[in-house]
Every structure is written in C-alpha cells, then in structure tokens.
C-alpha cells in the first residue's frame, strides 16, 4: 500500500513498549509519516489513577496534533487503551486505534485450553479484560500475572541494558511447573521486546501471542478511507515528556525506531 501523500500516524505509550506495535505497522506501511510519543514523565501507567491517564493522554495528543496534523492515532499501550479511548474519540474526528490483549486468538490456538495472560497490574484488574476472557476464553483455564517488573526489564533492554533472566524467572515462577500451559498472551506492548527471554523461562509454551500484527492490519484498513490533512513530507520523530538520563538511551531508541530526532515536550 503506497501513498502519494504521507498520512501522519501517532503512536502513544507511557514508555517505549509501544515501539513493538510501531515496528509492525512500519513494516507493513513503510511510506507513512510516523510520530511516537512516550510519556516517561508519568511512567508507568499501570498503577496510576484512571482520570490522570485520560487527562494526560488527551492533553499530549492534542498538543502534538497542533504541531503535526494527525490522520490516525494508535494508543500503543494496553493499560491506557482500557480507559482513554472514549474520551479521545469524543475529542478527535480521526480514527483512534486501541491495543487489546490477544485473548481470542490465544484461546483459539491453544491445544490444551490452558492459557496465560501476562500484563500490567492495571490491565489485569480492568473489567474490560475480564469481559474479553468471559466472551472469548470461557472454555479455557486462564492464568494471570500482573507485573510492573517485566515492563521495567523491557525498558532497560531497549535502552541498551542487560536482561536479568533470574529476575524474569522469578516473575514467571507461578507458571514454570504448569505443563499444560501452551499459549501465553503478551498483554503489554513492552513484552514482545523481551519475547525471546520469556520463551526461555517458559519452555513448555508453544504459542506467544501479541497484538502488533493485528493493529498494523487495522491501521492499513482505516487509512483507506481518510483524507490526508497535511501535504508536507516530514521526518519520523519521537517525543518524550521528561529528558532521558543518558545519550546512549537516546541513541538506542532513535536507532531502534529509525527516528530523525527526539523532541522533549514541555508539560
């Protein structure tokens, strides 16, 4: 799918985990104009108040939209997606795509009908997620782990740090003796970044399922019906809400996403 004029797509997350979704979309649609924003000034979202998450997400997206007219927004954060989508859709007239844990495909893939959901504590406790399980995995035994530590490990890895497998194994230890567990939902956009390490800790699991490819296909479908707002060719940029601690982290993120520059948004 090629565009004569680049649509501008914003990916939004509290951290850099949403880059896993961004990469899937960019691979499918390389000719778009991409912006990525991570709200590291309020990271992580998982245990924050819902109203604060909604207010910050809306304010930041509106600020970016003023400078770079957006054609589509992807909330590349499972926790935020469970609370912010209605408010964003009320305030924007463009398509808004959320991130939903891939519970339905995991339940369909599972041969033993014993599946696991790894997500943030915020995502795990949402009624929305329990409804997904009730609607699409009612015939399965569903295990759940809510972890902030795994999010931090993924952030560290993307910024050039080492992954401590012992810490990872400790977080996943409740599942290590579950021999019938054969499908795991990576219910946070950070977790595909450490998928290989998670696989090492759970060798009995045959299927690790995330939402990235499905979101990319959804973006492609929605772009067919839009009229591009800005006709100017632009570079791909990444935004944050707080300065990063070191230049190495900045360069790692720029290189991973092939961004031209990192811009710090003032609060």
Curated annotation (Swiss-Prot):
MF-aspect GO terms: glutamate racemase activity
UniProt cross-references to Gene3D superfamilies, sorted A to Z: 3.40.50.1860
Pathway per the UniProt entry: Cell wall biogenesis; peptidoglycan biosynthesis
Substrates-to-products reaction catalysed: L-glutamate = D-glutamate
Binding site for substrate: 13-14, 45-46, 78-79, 189-190
EC number: 5.1.1.3
Keywords: Cell shape, Cell wall biogenesis/degradation, Isomerase, Peptidoglycan synthesis
InterPro entries: Asp/Glu/hydantoin_racemase, Asp/Glu_race, Asp/Glu_racemase_AS_1, Asp/Glu_racemase_AS_2, Glu_race
Catalytic center residues: 77, 188
Gene Ontology annotations of biological process type: cell wall organization; peptidoglycan biosynthetic process; regulation of cell shape
UniProt-listed Pfam families: Asp_Glu_race
Protein family membership: Belongs to the aspartate/glutamate racemases family.
Primary role: Provides the (R)-glutamate required for cell wall biosynthesis.
Official protein name in the record: Glutamate racemase
């Amino acid at each position: 799918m090629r565009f004569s004029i680049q649509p501008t797509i914003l990916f939004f997350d509290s951290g850099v985990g949403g880059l896993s979704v961004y990469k899937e979309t960019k691979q499918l649609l390389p000719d778009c104009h991409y912006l990525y924003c991570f709200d590291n000034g309020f990271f992580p979202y998982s245990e924050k108040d819902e109203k604060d998450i909604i207010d910050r997400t809306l304010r930041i997206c509106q600020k970016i939209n003023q400078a770079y007219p957006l054609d589509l927004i992807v909330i590349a954060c499972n926790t935020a997606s469970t609370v912010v989508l209605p408010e964003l859709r009320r305030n924007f007239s463009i398509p808004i795509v959320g991130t939903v844990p891939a519970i339905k495909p995991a339940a369909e893939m599972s041969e033993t009908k014993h599946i696991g959901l790894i997500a943030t504590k915020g995502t795990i406790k949402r009624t929305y997620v329990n409804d997904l399980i009730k609607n699409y995995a009612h015939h399965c035994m569903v295990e759940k782990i809510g972890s902030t530590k795994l999010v931090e490990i993924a952030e560290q890895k993307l910024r050039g740090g080492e992954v401590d497998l012992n810490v990872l194994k400790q977080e996943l230890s409740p599942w290590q003796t579950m021999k019938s567990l054969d499908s795991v939902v990576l219910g946070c956009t950070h977790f595909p970044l450490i998928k290989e390490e998670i696989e090492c800790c759970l060798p009995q699991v045959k299927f690790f399922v995330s939402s990235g490819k499905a979101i990319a296909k959804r973006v492609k479908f929605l772009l067919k019906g839009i009229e591009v707002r800005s006709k100017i060719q632009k570079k791909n940029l990444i935004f944050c809400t707080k300065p990063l601690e070191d230049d190495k982290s900045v360069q790692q993120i720029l290189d991973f996403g092939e961004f031209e520059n990192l811009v710090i948004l003032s609060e």
